[in-house]
Amino acid sequence: MREGRWVTVTESEFEHERRGLEAIRQKLPDGDPWRAWSNFTFTANTGHVREVDLLVVAPGGLCMVELKDWHGSVTSENGTWVQTTPGGRRRTHGNPLHLVNRKAKELAGLLAQPGAKRVWVAEAVCFTDNGLRVRLPAHDQNGVYTVDELVDMLKQAPSDERRRVTAIGSREVAAALKNIGIRKSDAQYKVGPYELERKSFDSGPTWADYLARHSDLPEAARVRIYLSERGSDASLRQSVENAARREAAVLGRFKHPGAVQLKQYFPSGHAAGPALIFDYHPHTQKLDEYLVQYGEKLDILGRMALVRQLAETVRSAHASRIHHRALAARSVLVVPRSRGGKGRAVGEEAAWLTPQLQISDWQIATQRSGDSSQGQGMTRFAPTALSAMHLADDADAYLAPELTALNPDPVYLDVYGLGVLTYLLVTGKAPAASQAELLARLEAGEGLRPSSLVDGLSEDVDELVQAATAYRPGQRLSSVDEFLELLEVVEDSLTAPAAALDGPAEDETGASADKDPLEVVAGDLLAGRWEVRRRLGTGSTSRAFLVRDLEAETRRTRPLAVLKVALSDSRGEILVREAEAMRRLRPHSGIIRLAEPEPLHIGGRTVLALEYVGDERDDDGPGAEGATRPRRREETVARQLREHGRLPVDQLEAYGDYLFGAVDFLEGEGIWHRDIKPDNIAVRIRPNRTRELVLIDFSLAGYPAKNTDAGTDGYLDPFVDVITRGSYDSHAERYAVAVTLHQMASGELPKWGDGSVLPRMTDPKEWPYPTIAAEAFDPAVRDGLVAFFQKALHRDAGKRFPELKPMRDAWRKVFLDASQTVPSSHRTRPAAPADGAAPAEGAAAGIADAEPETAEQQRDRLAAEVTRDTPLTVSGLTPAAQSFLYGLGITTVGELLDYSRRKLVNAPGLGAKTRNEVQQRQREWGERLREAPVSPLTPKGRAEAKEELEQLTAAESALVGQLATGESAGALSARTLRSVSLDTLATVLVPAVNNNGSNRNKAEMVRLLLRLPDEHGVLPGIGVWPKQKDVADALGLSHGRIPQMLKDERKRWKAEPAVQALRDEIIELLASMGRVASAVEIADALAVRRGTHLAGREQRRAMALAAVRAVVEVEQLVPQEVEFQHQPNRKATDESLGAGLLALDVREDDAPDTPTAPGLLDYATRLGKTADRLARLDTLPTAATVLAELGALTVPPGAVDWDERRMVELAAAASVNAAATPRLEIYPRDLSLVRALRLTQAGLVRWIPGVPEGRQPGLTGEDVHERVRARFPELVVPDGRGGTAHELPTAGPLTKALRDAGFELSLSMREDTGTLRYLPTRVDEASSYLTTGAWRQSTRTGTVTRYADDPQLAGAVRAEERLLASAHRDGYRVLTVRQQLVRDAVRELGAERLGGQAVSVTELFLEALHGQVTPGTKPTWETLLKADAAEPGSKGAVRFAEYARTAWGSVEPRIAELLGDGGGGAGPVLLTEAGVFARYDAMGVLDRLASAARRGGRGLWLLVPQSDPSREPRLGQVAVPYQAGLGEWIQLPDTWVGNRHRGSGEVVASGVEGDAK
């Protein structure tokens, strides 16, 4: 193609790009309609400035091409593309097709002219290096080409002649491009003093991130530019501006090493919109990309350390009342650590294995702020319904289900985010491809269990993830503090085996001395004195550790202390200032003390030693391993408010009295705390169980009074720096006290104005004081508290209390007046001290003792005995719940059951734990004491549907009842329509019976067809997708009558706005699931999104399937308007699969390469048949076999964008009897329970050393069920009546199945809890099914574990475990070993326990080569040897290459034959002396052998000798390919080869069935 037709808008600055473009230009035709433009930019309607490498106009349409000059090989791991360079370095890339697709759609939108012919822009990625080995899965190869393949694709005729581009159309495109303003690619852009790179490296719907450099200083930065869409309405533009200001305001306030650091905010910094400048490390990676590159090198403890980093950052944000709300893999940045202990530099790998995580993307964060000057930004620009539009698409799978609800709890959103990120860190995989897919799995009962993907994982990790990610917020952990406590349990369980070893490590002190104090772990010793117990958390200036002072006895001090380690030298100065302030204080029981008067200097860090304030019970001596003493926790008043809501009146009086006493003491000492708030009031629990409050954190006490900004937003007096004051004073200190008291009394902060302006900008006449949360106060003290706070929080300091004493007297008077009047509510009383326990010295009166351990059991017993008339005082509710309910006028259980659940949830002053407790009891008692909802079609159900609509939105309250009565709902917004529950939808779909009963048959026909429960809650017994014939038979009507009646209902449904909104939602779900999904999968997603009051899983699914069925029926009304098709699966053995599949058809706005619905359904059918064939195999097929078999099927025409997991799931959904495990194995749904128990090793019993047998936790039946369900979620068992059931057996049948599976277990009662659990029948002979940690091992003293203190021994054990796990399975493994130890390694690998069959590849090759030489003929053997050393390209070298290829043709089938021998149970084929693969250009042979091993038969092990086994495997100078996601690389440390790990004990690996993987 000549210049002119090919327009080079900008000459590329890269030589490789110029070469690639020239290669394409030479091959393109030079005639109409062909045209091309290279290297230009355009500005999309969204505001994004897009860079385009090449745009080609061809007869088949327009194509946007992204050029990639990659070398080596490219693979895909968990959706991330990984390039392995010829030098062996791995580089991660996002799938470039996604961005090109987005840019193509944006350009097509610009080219679209009103009234003109629609222009389609396809997308393509072109690899310009023909030597690149592309090993992408089939779904990732759509749109990926070499130069020749690209040109061939462009020359193809259009699939639809209506879309052919003619010469005239080509000229119109050229004119349109000129009109939209394609232009030269500016090399740089500017924002303030920063010059931007020309391509953004990341982007979202409303923003783009650029790398930038300062024009004058040598510093790099990340610049985020927020973009406003052209022509968007004012609300959208305002939402974008607010997102930018919100992110800037949050990060301007929240300074923490675990959050990205904002450098500067330019509200008008760029022509496109606001700009934010962030600090940026050039090697920063996103979390999912980091795990692809370094995940294999992280052990489970390293992964948990990263989880802790994230959780501590989020906890610190929550302490500042900031909530991220949208945690996802892309919002976590990974930065290599720059230094180790004592400031020493660390190596590259060590820097990446202990990185710093930083949370980014705070654009939809919230801050529940008070009203200081900075805080108003967060209130003024609070997230709205439009906020989710600012999130990138790849965050979708990580977002909490309720994010888009009207008012979701931000704490629960962040807890959920931490849970899914924990799942990602542990498994290396995202929880799902999309949120819709994940919701469907959650509704189907498949919780997130990392152990379903990772062998040998601690059960505590599963518990942590499941407790954080329950899809009902009320069932999640209620705070990040609880998450961290459960994380500590996980860390304890992971490190427990190492603690069981006899004797301390000899070099313990020395090892700890060299460690960076910031990185110490439990057991480390600092400065020879402080023994680390655990890490408490990380703040903005320091990291805190709980330690035991080994010199406490001689110094006569408390045994426990807290060390605050400064995060940097500058932050160390803050600790020094804090110590100076605290040294001036005399001892006081209510004020935290220094354990050491001067700051310490340990390991190059400044360290402050403080007394420990927390749970001191049972700390004077180490408890027995496994003892059941209560877990220590650090409690603050803030945590108590978060979990239980406002304080009961008696506690409020006592806590307030304490606070006044502490502040009075500080005034006498001449000190201002300057940061008084509930977070800084700790609760000490003494050994005798009494409590006292302690004021902590004096880090701001030494700040100059002129610095009026120091403090926490919301508690800082917003009028402190007015002209009449100008510096911090006692009024400001008392203002913080008043705000803290207000929060204790109500659970809320006072608020100035409506949040639209700063507090000092409010009208003094209208706002002399803030809004007091009077409704949240206890009625007994409400009037007195309102008067108190109106004076204490007055904007004019002259009208406040002049001194602390009158303020304290007024506070006491509130409670004195309340005690002298007839109480209108119950008041709680503090618990009496335990017998013989005297109150702690200085403890405030009225602070209740710590609750006994059995309190929860006592409450459960009381709750089980209640009736409707039972008073709340004896109902088993906690005092906090009782106090709150009394405030609502509720005094009995019956009154609570009759109270509206919705009103209860929204009541002010209610804490998270208290809310969960009340809701749980309300559900529990409701099921037992009142009629549970059985069907929405009862009169009561229809009335509740009407009530639901009344509460959907206040703005639309005039439309009450329109849906429930079948009237027009056209005025309801789409957002409101999508909030309608499934119960209310059922009342829309099924007409109410007339008074005269004339439409009774029609109503019953609809109910039966949709399979909705009757008035007794019974579902029709005619299948999950009833046939019209069955409905007619059930009603006694003719078969022809049903279609007639149904036609009228279809018309009515089609006209209903609620059904239209439901149809749009289902189409969106289909699009997000790859255009095909099972009806059940769609239904499960709807059940989570919409909700239903029915409790049973079968009933919930039936309600959702009814909604899907109605939309399918409506779709069939007008065939010409069909946008999706339905295909039933009548032969399925599982009833739920009978509902069949839905497939999205090609629509008006879809791309030309979109596959049709019939094509997709046919493909799914073929996948289902293949899955059924795999399920019938005698051996459970591995993931590699499944993917190979399914991948071999012909894909329908068009782009099918399914990842491997989606393909396997759809194959199972379209099958008759197949199901898929989370590991992508295929199994029959009626798999034998005995075999399932054996495959999952569900009978392994956790045995805690040192704990008596009667108190061993053992293994409960529920534990066994969970282990089986985690691996085989769709397993069914015989029900004894000729059918099958999902419920797994219990008691005797389960015990028999366990014994048949090889686990000799028996049921017995646990003494301390009274629960039934399994224990080994004979403990002394049970070593084959005991586990003491993540992997089973011998219980003999001296056993070496993967948690051994010696990392070399631990590495050897890990290698042993992985070798044993793969020795008798198919698959491919690359083993790296030190070069000098090859012979010993071969001997160990060939030992009986591993059974490797050593095969010398060099010997086979030479034998095959020698076989081609006939004695007495030419060439001779000597001639061949000379040719081997000939110059490359010479005649001899070319001739030798021919002989080598022939030799490999003989070697490959010989090795393949070995792989096929012996079946899956034989030992692996061990390839040694394999360097000839690389030397004689036979890496392709190795690839084919590896692929064969992955498909079944014997395993293939490749031994690769190297100078350093920890380096990426290489044969000579050639990188050895392997799949990291399948764990195919195993490092063999010197300790493993030397058998040191087996010298002092025997490692017993979990024996699994040979076909497991």
Curated annotation (Swiss-Prot):
Pfam family for this entry, one: NERD
Induction cue: Constitutively expressed, probably part of a pglW-pglX operon.
Protein keywords: Antiviral defense, ATP-binding, Kinase, Nucleotide-binding, Repeat, Transferase
Record note on disruption phenotype: Strain is no longer resistant to plaque formation by bacteriophage phiC31 (a Pgl- phenotype).
Biased composition (Low complexity): 830-849
PROSITE patterns in alphabetical order: NERD, PROTEIN_KINASE_ATP, PROTEIN_KINASE_DOM
UniProt cross-references to SUPFAM superfamilies, sorted A to Z: C-terminal domain of RNA polymerase alpha subunit, Protein kinase-like (PK-like)
SMART domains in the record: S_TKc
Ranges for domain Protein kinase: 195-490, 530-816
Residue ranges constituting the NERD domain according to the UniProt record: 12-130
Domain of life per record: Bacteria
Region Disordered: start-end pairs: 615-634, 821-861
InterPro entries: BREX_PglW (IPR049832), Kinase-like_dom_sf (IPR011009), NERD (IPR011528), Prot_kinase_dom (IPR000719), Protein_kinase_ATP_BS (IPR017441)
One annotated GO molecular function: protein serine/threonine kinase activity
Gene Ontology process terms (BP): defense response to virus
Record-listed ATP binding positions: 536-544, 564
Family membership: Belongs to the protein kinase superfamily. Ser/Thr protein kinase family.
Functional description taken from the UniProt entry: BREX systems (bacteriophage exclusion) provide immunity against bacteriophage. Part of a type 2 BREX system. Previously called the phage growth limitation (Pgl) system, it confers protection against bacteriophage phiC31. The bacteria allows one cycle of phage infection, but subsequent cycles are impaired, protecting the original bacterial colony. The system undergoes high rates (10(-3) to 10(-4)) of phase reversion, i.e. loss and regain of phiC31 resistance. Autophosphorylates when synthesized in vitro, cannot be expressed in E.coli.
Domain notes: The first protein kinase domain is predicted to be catalytically inactive.
Protein name: Probable kinase PglW
Source organism: Streptomyces coelicolor (strain ATCC BAA-471 / A3(2) / M145)
Classification of source organism: Bacteria, Bacillati, Actinomycetota, Actinomycetes, Kitasatosporales
